[in-house]
Amino acid sequence: MAAYQISYDLRKQKDYSSLIERIKSYGTWCHPLESTWIIVTEQTATQVRDYLKAVMDNDDGLLVTGLRGDGAWYGLSDNISQWLKNNL
């Protein structure tokens, strides 16, 4: 299983519901910042990108980055901090 950070910028209608539904479908996820999510999955970054971009407009932006266990953060809730410690 790998952890991926997902960042996005929806430029037109900013309808996040379909994208968020797809992100949450991974089951193991965290939403630490407004446009940033972290998921844990057996898929590759390319597979995650392709699955998510299917509900995005052509001018939206999406970045899926693999996380390798090292991380630092500031100003996040205790629940999110604990999730990160458990899953990174």
State what each model feature region is.
Residues 1-30, 36-43:
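Extended, hydrophobic alpha-helical segments
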Residues 2-3, 45, 54, 72:
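A sequence-composition feature that detects small, non-aromatic residues
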Residues 13, 46, 74:
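Loop/helix-junction capping segments adjacent to catalytic residues or to phosphate/diphosphate-binding pockets
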Residues 17, 42-56, 84-88:
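Positively charged, polar, low-complexity stretches
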Residues 19-21, 37, 52-54, 77-79, ...:
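Surface-exposed beta-strand edges and their flanking turn/coil or helix-capping segments
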Residues 25-31, 55-62:
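A common structural junction motif
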Residues 32-37, 63-67:
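A generic structural motif
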Residues 56-88:
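C-terminal structural segments of small proteins and small subunits
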